[in-house]
């Protein structure tokens, strides 16, 4: 969140945050929202306005700025509400990341109570790897939950095949999406696509041989592009 929010009164800060989100969709044609709260205060999120008000005034600092966990949690919950209101996906970073990630607080399952009755669309990006089985089960259990395998390809290299296999064993196929999480170097995108195409083909062939699916090409196309096109 922008540190300038802390220069406003609590109610004004929340109002400004909400209006900014709505404008991004309505006026700037954003496709959805993304949270990296896993990098800040983790995914053990509590939606409590009183706690948010108290933490808003707390001046405890972290490397990223004011900690204000209760306030950050509250804005996360507000984002869920607005994403549902505007019918756009809300991506949430889960699992491993850069060296500043709070990995012990980034397990997808920490979001279980928040998504249990949620009627919007939550995307667990990076499939929560290495906690991808949790993401797959959540996608199976809760209508609101989707996942993508960005970052797994190419950074998990050959483990990407295992991740795809394990995710597709549990999650509905129409809830799994390819992604790369690539940046800066175009070669990373190329390697990601190359590995994904290889392993999704191998996994789909295995599933067809085991008679779990009857059309491997359809499954490949769904995960590679169709699911994301429908969601976004």
What are the residue ranges of the model-derived segments?
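Long, mid-chain structured domain cores
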Residues: 1-14, 18
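Short amphipathic alpha-helices and their capping/turn segments at secondary-structure boundaries
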Residues: 14-33, 76-85, 164-171
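Divalent metal-binding pocket/active-site signature
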Residues: 28-137
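Glycine-enriched alpha-helix->loop->beta-strand junction motifs that scaffold or abut catalytic
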Residues: 86-89, 117-121, 140-146, 173-174, ...
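Short acidic/histidine-rich active-site segments
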Residues: 93, 125-126, 171-193
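Histidine/acidic-residue-rich catalytic or RNA/ligand-binding cores of hydrolases
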Residues: 102-109, 132-141, 157-165, 185-202
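His/Asp/Glu-enriched short active-site or ligand-binding loop at hydrolase and phosphoryl-transfer sites
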Residues: 146-157
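Mid-to-C-terminal alpha-helical segments outside catalytic/metal-binding sites
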Residues: 173-175, 190-232
């Amino acid at each position: 969140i922008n540190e300038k929010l802390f220069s406003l009164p609590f109610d004004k800060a929340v109002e400004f945050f909400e209006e900014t989100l709505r404008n991004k969709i309505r006026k700037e044609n954003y496709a959805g929202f993304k949270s990296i709260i896993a990098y800040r205060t983790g995914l053990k999120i509590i939606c409590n306005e009183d706690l948010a008000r108290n933490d808003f005034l707390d001046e405890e600092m972290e490397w990223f700025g004011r900690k204000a966990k209760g306030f950050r949690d509250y804005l996360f919950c507000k984002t869920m509400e607005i994403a549902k209101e505007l019918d756009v996906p809300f991506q949430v970073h889960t699992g491993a990341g850069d060296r500043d990630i709070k990995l012990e607080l980034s397990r997808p399952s920490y979001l279980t109570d928040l998504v249990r009755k949620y009627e919007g669309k939550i995307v667990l990006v990076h499939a929560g790897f290495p906690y991808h089985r949790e993401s797959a089960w959540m996608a199976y259990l809760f209508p609101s939950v989707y996942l993508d395998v960005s970052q797994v390809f190419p950074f998990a290299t050959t483990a990407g095949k295992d991740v795809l296999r394990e995710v597709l064993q549990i999650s509905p196929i129409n809830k799994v999406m390819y992604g790369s999480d690539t940046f800066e170097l175009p070669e990373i995108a190329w390697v990601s696509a190359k590995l994904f195409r290889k392993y999704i083909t191998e996994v789909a062939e295995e599933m067809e041989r085991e008679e779990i699916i009857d059309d491997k090409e359809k499954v490949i196309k769904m995960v590679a592009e169709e699911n994301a096109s429908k969601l976004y």
